[in-house]
C-alpha cells in the first residue's frame, strides 16, 4: 500500500505499454486497467515522495470543485495555474491573439468581463458534482446527497457521484478524467473510497488526483463522523506521455520515503466551508521536483 505500487505501475507502462497516438499529438505509452490501494486509517496521505508534489495546489483544486465553480479565476487568484492551458488554447484559437499563459492569467485577474467570457471551462467537475441538470428539469447536488446518505444509510451501495454527463460533454473544456467516486462504510465506521479514472496521465495528473481524492475522503469522513479506511484507485487508459519518459525513468531511480500525515485542524459544519489552512501536512520529505510539459 506504499508508493512502490505507483513505481511498479510506471515500470509496467515503460516495459509493456502500447505505443499510441492520442488527441494531443504527443503520443503515449499506455496500459489498460490498473489498481492501487492506499491505507488512510493511520493518518497517512499518498503524496508521492520520489518527486516533490505541489500538494496544496491539488487540495485547492478539490476545494474549487466542491464550490461548484467552473471558472479559473478563483484558482488563478490563489496561484493555481493547472487549468489555465485549456481556456488559453480556446482564446488563442478564436481570437488569434498570442498571449503567454502569464499574460492570459493577468487579464483574467484584471478584467471581470474577460474572465467571465474566457475563463469559464464549461460544465466541468464542479457543475456536475453540485448542479447536475436532470432531464426532468431538476438540479441535483450529488455531494449533498452523498453526505446525507453517509449519515443516514451508511450501508447503502448507492453512495457515489460522477461527472460524465453525456448531454454536456461537448460543452466541457475537458471531459472528466477522474469521473466516478464510490464510497463504502465498514461495520466499524471506516470510510472507504474507490475512484475510477478513465484516463490517467501518470507523471503529471495522477499524483494530483491521489492527493485530491484523499483530501476529499478526509472531508467526507469528517462531515459524516467516520474514521478513514482505504482509498482504492482504478484506472482505465493509464499512460505516460512520450515527452515524460525520461522524467519517469529518473523518478524510478529514486528510493521512496514514508508518506506524510494529514490532519484536519478545523471541523466546519459544511463541506463547502473548508479552507486550505485546515489541511495540516506533516512529515513530507520528498526528493526534488521533476518538471514536465502538460499535453493539451
UniProtKB/Swiss-Prot annotation:
Q: Which residues hold (6R)-5,10-methylene-5,6,7,8-tetrahydrofolate?
A: 201, 295
Entry-linked Gene3D superfamilies: Thymidylate synthase/dCMP hydroxymethylase domain
Q: What's one Pfam family the UniProt record gives for this protein?
A: Thymidylat_synt
Q: What is its EC number?
A: 2.1.1.45
What interactions and quaternary structure are annotated?
A: Homodimer.
The task this protein performs is described as: Catalyzes the reductive methylation of 2'-deoxyuridine-5'-monophosphate (dUMP) to 2'-deoxythymidine-5'-monophosphate (dTMP) while utilizing 5,10-methylenetetrahydrofolate (mTHF) as the methyl donor and reductant in the reaction, yielding dihydrofolate (DHF) as a by-product. This enzymatic reaction provides an intracellular de novo source of dTMP, an essential precursor for DNA biosynthesis.
What is the designated name of this protein? Answer: Thymidylate synthase
Q: Which gene encodes it?
A: thyA
